[in-house]
């Protein structure tokens, strides 16, 4: 009897693994913030975040695969200083009127059972370049308020403004143009 029960349980486990599916998480714009930081003539560091972000993360834990598709509104950049915000939105920098979005699409890479990086492409100022984001932390919980699964992560990568054709790139040539991009995300499991 015990042997039969174990066989049935093993069969159920194999069946559930065989039919594992991808789960889509819709990013919560109130808890998702890409941020950038870069040198200001080498004497200090400017830090800003983007307030309007949307997108999805798809994960298949059994297959250890996943994808990310994120869109950021370029005119939502906020450095905490109106003059810098306007400069960043102008045609010297993001040129948000002409290029209203920053886009990132990538594939999630697993190490063991954990997602550890995203290998993808970022499009800024109409220029697309490869960008790998290292996942610093990630966790999923049954959210106490939403009563459904919510996942969050913190990731970062490096890019260089000089590669994206911005007029201000001349001030950030070489190492001076290096920028740290970080993104904190939270997403709710999409109902099927």
Regions found by a protein language model. Give the residues of each.
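Low-complexity, acidic/polar, glycine-enriched regions of mature
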Residues: 20-192
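N-terminal signal peptide c-region/cleavage motif recognized by signal peptidases
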Residues: 15-18
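Bacterial N-terminal signal peptides that target proteins for export
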Residues: 1-6
